[in-house]
């Protein structure tokens, strides 16, 4: 690799600024002249990484209030449909708790049997400064208790006044509007800082009504509520409202940075078109204390954090609220208000979840030589969950149903990794991690029991029978997870790099996979975090998932990166993959104590089960300039994704695997304008999970138009998505259960019925304006 001259002072300043210590970078440094350096070592943790950074974020923020959607242009990343601010990212077909997702270093988990509040939903897109994604081959310092990859989200780093400036005051205010759903919102950020102290606030508010599809996709109007109907192109239960607040305080010295962040969120409502319930309230508070200390031998980082979530669910305005014989019974398309609340009359179905998460991390980074770096660290995470359903009448009567009581999931991990430059062209990173995961849950009861906490028999759907069996079982579980990774980068030439990685990853089952105990159809339907309309039952005998992944990236590019092409093939084999098997055909049948339901066209009940799986595919991404004309500089960007997943025990397809898809973008830069014409192509989906009766979807193509202009202190974004108002169905959006009698699986002419996938949004005209000061 050729050498080049580099002044010491700018190099030192750049390195110190990169470590978040601008105070050191800004101090006077004695000029030592010029030295020659050879093959500067990049961060090995950047291998197999994709980043959404400050350059890409502004245009993405204008189109969405869902932070997970900021990842939609990355190769290998797709989204599971959920609420308007709560999509779940998937990497190569592995999603949710198969990924390790952190927000400012905090490991967070959903606090809901439907996973309505996944980690990325706790930030507004305007609060995000950068997102790093490791697909499958994550270093052990960033991985753990996951098999699919890692997503790390960072909010804005603290800003400080420059030497001699005295104080720094800055901020921004923004607003947006999106026509489809009448979505609107505002955001505000402000900072006051001296050379050593920084204080900042960031707030954001977003609200939307239901969005419309690109055409009629259903044959009914009723919602289950008297006097309330929805147009046949309106996607029910897609409205939302969310408010986010963040306060940050930071202090720095020459070699130390201490930062405290407080995050508060309130979501008074968020609908879910692929779930039986809606979020009727969600309040969360997070406190995060971080220390970074530069020392002569390297760097020491420590963090402690705490989160508390109070979550409520019930039937939103597009779903039936009144149940029981006095409301018209199960065949009524609209439930009538009734009283008194009791065996014949139910007012909704309130469900509550409370979660407390406390964590700590410490990591030491030791530079042994100018070619070798060692990282060692330890982590603790303590997760507590209670999930109960208050009595509301009819079948939900007369006692409280405990879905999970005194749920516990504790993680303790240690790891070490070694990064070294074997030669000027070869960088390698190898690591080993051990993690112990302990889970437990307390005794439960259903709505019906003779003598608390459990006794007797019967109850709707075998509630008491199931509760007795669960309570008499040993519920304590211990899992010993091992995580190994080895990644390499070889620079073949100035225009060609190869990355090669091997990884062994392990994940312990979640609390809901283990402890959702009731086989009752209604209760099982409420325990679903994949949005397929089915009901799920936990399994105390689940083993941990064990995945082996091989991946490579072939990267051709210009020396100045003006053009580039990346190909990333990957292969993953998972032992004890947590899939599902069918329960019996009868509503009251224990699971799996009766012959499985053979249906191919209805919603089902399933129980989690360990099986084996295989996932493979190819990611392609590239960019190139096309021409420079009087109308500006034109370029082309391409992202292609192909993933196949198979259950090796049954030969069935894996659930929610995105079919072949491509995103082609023609870009234009002209006199301050950055514009794009985007074509999104998705193949029809027929390789589905038959055990779940997953719904097939047709292929489609969408055209999006995006324009933006930046002035010194003003930025304007506007555009049109789904320009031709195409009706299409989301391949990973789940089953449509967004309106009607959603508590159960009703008979015709009532709805919801199996067979309709959630449609994507129709034409949407959007605009966003940001003013900086």
Regions found by a protein language model. Name each.
Residues 214, 507, 580, 683-687, ...:
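C-terminal beta-signal and adjacent terminal beta-strands/loops
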Residues 108-137:
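Short acidic/polar hinge/loop motifs at secondary-structure boundaries
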Residues 277-296, 353-355, 403-411, 464-466, ...:
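Outer-membrane beta-barrel signature, preferentially recognizing the C-terminal barrel domain
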Residues 215-235, 314-350, 388-402, 440-476, ...:
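Solvent-exposed loop segments that connect transmembrane elements
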Residues 421-427, 436, 562-578, 583, ...:
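Gram-negative outer-membrane beta-barrel transporters
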Residues 33-68, 88, 96:
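N-terminal periplasmic "start-of-domain" segments of outer-membrane beta-barrel proteins
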Residues 242, 255-300, 308-340, 345-357, ...:
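Flexible loop and strand-edge segments within Gram-negative outer membrane beta-barrel domains
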Residues 159, 167-174, 178-185, 189-282, ...:
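Periplasmic-side early beta-strands and strand-to-turn transitions of outer-membrane beta-barrels
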């Amino acid at each position: 690799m050729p050498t080049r001259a580099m002044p010491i002072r700018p190099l030192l300043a750049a390195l110190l600024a990169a470590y978040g210590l601008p105070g050191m970078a800004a101090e006077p440094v004695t000029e030592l002249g010029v030295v020659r350096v050879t093959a500067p070592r990049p961060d090995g943790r950047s291998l197999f990484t994709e980043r959404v950074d400050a350059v890409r974020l502004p245009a993405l923020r204008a189109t969405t209030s869902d932070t997970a959607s900021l990842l939609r242009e990355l190769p290998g990343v797709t989204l599971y449909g959920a609420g308007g601010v709560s999509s779940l990212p998937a990497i190569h077909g592995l999603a949710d708790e198969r990924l390790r997702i952190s927000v400012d270093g905090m490991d967070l988990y959903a606090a809901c049997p439907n996973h309505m509040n996944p980690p990325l939903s706790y930030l507004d897109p305007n609060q995000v400064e950068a997102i790093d994604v490791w697909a499958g081959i994550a270093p052990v310092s960033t991985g753990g208790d996951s098999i699919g990859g890692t997503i790390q989200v960072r909010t804005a780093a603290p800003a400080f006044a420059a030497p001699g400036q005295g104080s720094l005051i800055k901020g921004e205010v923004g607003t947006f509007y999106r026509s489809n759903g009448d979505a609107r919102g505002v955001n505000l950020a402000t900072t006051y800082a001296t050379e050593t102290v920084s204080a900042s606030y960031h707030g954001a508010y977003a609200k939307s009504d239901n969005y419309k599809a690109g055409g009629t996709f259903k044959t009914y109007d009723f919602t289950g509520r008297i006097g309330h109907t929805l147009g046949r192109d309106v996607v029910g239960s897609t409205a939302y409202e969310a408010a986010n607040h963040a306060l940050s305080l930071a202090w720095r010295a020459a070699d130390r940075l201490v930062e405290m962040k407080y995050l508060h969120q309130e979501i008074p409502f968020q609908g879910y078109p692929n779930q039986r319930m809606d979020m009727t309230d969600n309040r969360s508070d997070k406190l995060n204390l971080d220390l970074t200390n530069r020392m002569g031998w390297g760097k020491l980082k420590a963090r402690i954090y705490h989160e508390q979530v109070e979550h409520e669910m019930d039937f939103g305005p597009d779903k039936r609220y009144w149940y029981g014989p006095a409301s018209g019974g199960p065949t009524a398309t609209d439930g009538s208000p009734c009283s008194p609340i009791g065996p014949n009359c139910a007012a909704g179905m309130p469900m509550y979840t409370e979660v407390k998460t406390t964590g700590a991390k410490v990591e030491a980074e030791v530079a042994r030589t100018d070619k070798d770096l060692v990282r060692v660290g330890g982590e603790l995470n303590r997760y507590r969950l209670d999930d109960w359903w208050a009595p509301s009448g009819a079948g939900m009567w007369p006692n409280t149903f405990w879905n999970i009581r005194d749920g516990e999931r504790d993680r303790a991990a240690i790891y070490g990794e070694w990064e070294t430059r074997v030669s000027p062209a070869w960088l390698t990173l190898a690591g080993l991690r051990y993690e112990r995961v302990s889970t437990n849950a307390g005794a439960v009861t259903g709505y019906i029991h003779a003598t608390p906490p459990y006794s007797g028999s019967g109850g709707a759907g075998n509630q008491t029978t199931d509760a007795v069996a669960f309570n008499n079982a040993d519920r304590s579980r211990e899992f010993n997870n091992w995580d190994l990774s080895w990644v390499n980068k070889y620079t073949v030439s100035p225009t060609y790099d190869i990355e090669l990685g091997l990884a062994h990853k392990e994940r312990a089952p979640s609390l809901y996979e283990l402890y959702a105990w009731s086989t009752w159809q209604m209760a099982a339907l409420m325990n679903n975090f994949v949005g397929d309309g089915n009901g799920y039952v936990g399994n105390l005998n689940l083993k941990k998932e064990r995945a082996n992944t091989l991946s490579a990236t072939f990267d051709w590019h210009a020396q100045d990166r003006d053009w580039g092409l990346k190909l990333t093939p990957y292969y993953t084999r998972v032992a004890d993959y947590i899939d599902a098997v069918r329960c019996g055909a009868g509503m009251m049948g224990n699971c799996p104590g009766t012959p499985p339901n053979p249906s191919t066209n209805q919603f089902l009940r399933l129980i989690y089960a360990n099986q084996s799986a295989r996932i493979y595919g190819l990611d392609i991404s590239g960019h190139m300039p096309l021409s420079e004309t009087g109308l500006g500089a034109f370029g082309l960007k391409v992202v292609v994704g192909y993933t196949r997943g198979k259950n090796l025990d049954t030969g069935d397809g894996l659930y929610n695997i995105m079919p072949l898809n491509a995103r082609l973008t023609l870009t234009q830069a002209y006199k301050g304008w950055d514009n794009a014409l985007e074509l999104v192509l998705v193949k029809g989906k027929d390789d589905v999970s038959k055990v779940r009766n997953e719904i097939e979807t047709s292929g489609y193509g969408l055209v999006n138009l995006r324009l933006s202009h930046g002035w010194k202190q003003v930025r304007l974004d506007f555009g049109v998505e789904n320009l031709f108002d195409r009706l299409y169905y989301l391949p990973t959006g789940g089953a449509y259960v967004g309106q009607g009698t959603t508590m159960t699986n009703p008979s015709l002419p009532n709805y919801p019925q199996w067979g309709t996938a959630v449609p994507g949004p129709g034409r949407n005209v959007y605009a966003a304006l940001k003013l900086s000061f």
